[in-house]
């Protein structure tokens, strides 16, 4: 499985055949099935994309043999034939141009050399992306080609890798869910296996979440995401989805979520997390601390390990200060305490900022999905009231500025700013 394909977006909802008549969808799917099978390159990705198409178009999974090339030609004619070629390239030959050229030869054998100019134009755009996009004047592909060009652009980019580490109960999974803008990670009260989660930002929003956890799911439900596949004997789970924020997140980013290192019932959590920190080449490390239980022996041990074994840039975040009360607790005093603690360990000029991961998660959920649970609604109202107070406006502790003036009348947007998540995202994505 080519892991990099997890950043590719599907375009099935923009596909013209989706709105075609039932018999045409059937003929199209059968012909596509034939073309994909003819490459003899079916892998996990191609099989799962074909399965996705079959489900979306309500097709049988039974293969039907073809008697002749002429039979195929009669099934798919007119405007859909170029979509057919693009689909076959996307499914079977995205990362292998030689296979793509063989597909083109087969296509021309079926439909005739008179389409050579258009077909070679499609091939050029498919593999060169935006570079050749404007050379293509095939109107039938107007909706699909921009998505494929964006896929190619994302696929070819170097990913920015951000590793996130913490002790248990710091709120790491909640922070990941807040950054991604979707519930893709287990929270602390769910049983977690010792796995490293890789979460990739996809090229476009296609309303699909991929998960590769021994098997590949291209439309992973919440239940699938929360239920680890016990057949997966590796220490990795990979997820692909389009990250959501109030600003477009158009960077190729991979968040690497390591297990909580002080999980007393399973020493492998610590071993896997430490190995990831020691061996992975990352652009940034985020260390999350629990503001309700700071400067513990567990934190001291892990922070010393990180200081010794990781030499890249680090952002330290203090979470769970939402229970602080004015007059009894101080955000600024807490931040200064953590800075002193880190300095004693040996960190030079540590960058420490407050965050409310839960407020950020609820804020994004309210914006993008809506909140039905009454307890979550109550928590959202509490966060609205508390975090708009000057002493609890976490964004004031960040060095950068985020302009949300166009959303100033929306409470949820103000909550995201006050929680610190928007400023953190700007530091991560640039």
Please provide the spans of the model-predicted regions.
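N-terminal low-complexity/disordered regulatory or targeting extensions
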Residues: 1-168, 182-243, 309, 342-343, ...
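C-terminal end of P-loop GTPase domains and the immediately downstream helical coupling element
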Residues: 2-32, 347-430
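Conserved glycine(s) of the Walker
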Residues: 171-172
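Switch II (G3) loop of P-loop NTPases
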Residues: 182-187, 248-270
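Glycine-rich phosphate-binding loops of NTPases
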Residues: 198-244, 249-250, 258, 263, ...
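Conserved beta-strand/loop subsegment of P-loop NTPase cores
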Residues: 254, 283-289, 309-325, 333-361
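Conserved Switch II/interswitch segment of TRAFAC-class P-loop GTPases
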Residues: 261-263, 280-300, 321-328
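Inter-motif core of Ras-like GTPase G domains
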Residues: 266-293, 306-312
């Amino acid at each position: 499985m080519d892991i990099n394909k997890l950043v590719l977006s599907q375009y099935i909802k923009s596909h013209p055949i989706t709105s075609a008549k039932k018999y045409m969808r059937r003929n199209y799917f059968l012909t596509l099935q034939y073309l994909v099978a003819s490459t003899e390159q079916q892998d996990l990705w191609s099989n799962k994309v074909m399965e996705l198409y079959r489900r979306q178009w309500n097709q049988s999974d039974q293969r039907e043999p073809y008697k002749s090339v002429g039979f195929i030609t009669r099934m798919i004619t007119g405007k859909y034939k170029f979509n057919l070629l693009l689909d076959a390239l996307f499914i079977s030959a995205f990362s292998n141009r030689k296979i793509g050229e063989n597909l083109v030869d087969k296509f021309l054998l079926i439909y005739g050399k008179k389409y050579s100019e258009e077909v070679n134009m499609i091939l050029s755009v498919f593999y060169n992306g935006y570079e050749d996009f404007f050379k293509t004047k095939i109107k039938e592909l107007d909706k699909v080609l921009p998505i494929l060009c964006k896929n190619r652009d994302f696929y070819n980019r170097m990913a920015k890798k951000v590793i996130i580490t913490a002790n248990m109960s710091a709120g790491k999974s909640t922070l990941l869910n807040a950054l991604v803008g979707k519930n893709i990670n287990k929270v602390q009260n769910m049983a977690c296996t010792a796995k490293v989660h890789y979460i990739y930002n996809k090229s476009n929003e296609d309303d699909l979440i991929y998960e590769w956890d021994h098997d590949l799911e291209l439309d992973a439900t919440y239940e699938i995401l929360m239920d680890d596949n016990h057949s997966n004997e590796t220490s990795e789970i990979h997820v692909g989805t389009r990250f959501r924020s109030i600003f477009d997140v158009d960077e190729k980013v991979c968040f690497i979520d390591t297990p909580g290192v002080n999980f007393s019932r399973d020493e492998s959590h610590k071993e896997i997390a430490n190995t990831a920190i020691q061996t992975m080449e990352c652009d940034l490390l985020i260390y999350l601390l629990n503001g309700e239980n700071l400067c513990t022996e567990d934190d001291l041990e892990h922070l010393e390990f990180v200081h010794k074994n990781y030499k890249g840039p680090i952002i330290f975040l203090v979470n769970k200060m939402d229970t602080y009360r004015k007059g009894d607790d101080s955000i600024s005093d807490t931040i200064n305490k953590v800075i002193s603690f880190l300095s004693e360990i040996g960190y030079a000029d540590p960058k420490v900022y407050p965050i409310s991961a839960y407020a950020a998660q609820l804020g994004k959920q309210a914006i993008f999905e809506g909140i039905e649970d009454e307890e979550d609604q109550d928590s959202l109202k509490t966060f609205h009231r508390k975090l708009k107070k000057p002493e609890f406006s976490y964004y004031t502790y960040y060095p950068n500025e985020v302009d949300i003036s166009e959303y100033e009348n929306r409470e949820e947007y103000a909550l995201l700013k006050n929680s610190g998540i928007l400023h953190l995202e700007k530091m991560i994505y640039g």
